[in-house]
Amino acid sequence: MIKNAFISLQEKKEESRGSVEFQVFSFTNKIRRLTSHLELHRKDYLSQRGLRKILGKRQRLLVYLSKKNRVRYKDLINKLNIRELKTR
């Protein structure tokens, strides 16, 4: 439901499945799905590794977006209910 609504919002702008926002959104869906899987299967180490890789990819995209356009970054963080990046 949420995914379809977000996709329809993104498609109204244009064919933007390669946009940073859409990529972060799809990674967030994968992360949530893997997290629920790992709650049931705690010893699934390959899924744990995949989760860490996806988390890293999403973090790199969020760092890129926060440097390029802070307003779009804040808007995306609020829409997806994820925490803001830690700054060093």
UniProtKB/Swiss-Prot annotation:
Compartments where located: Plastid, Chloroplast
Matching CDD domains: Ribosomal_S15p_S13e
GO biological process annotation, one example: translation
Pfam family, one: Ribosomal_S15
Keyword Lipid biosynthesis listed: no
Signal found in the keyword field: no
Chief location bin: plastid
InterPro entries found in the cross-reference section: Ribosomal_uS15, Ribosomal_uS15_bac-type, uS15_NS1_RNA-bd_sf
Keywords noted in UniProt: Chloroplast, Plastid, Ribonucleoprotein, Ribosomal protein
Entry GO terms, CC: chloroplast; ribonucleoprotein complex; ribosome
Annotated signal sequence range: none
Molecular function GO terms recorded: structural constituent of ribosome
Matching NCBIfam families: S15_bact
Self-association and partners: Part of the 30S ribosomal subunit.
Family: Belongs to the universal ribosomal protein uS15 family.
Record's protein name: Small ribosomal subunit protein uS15c
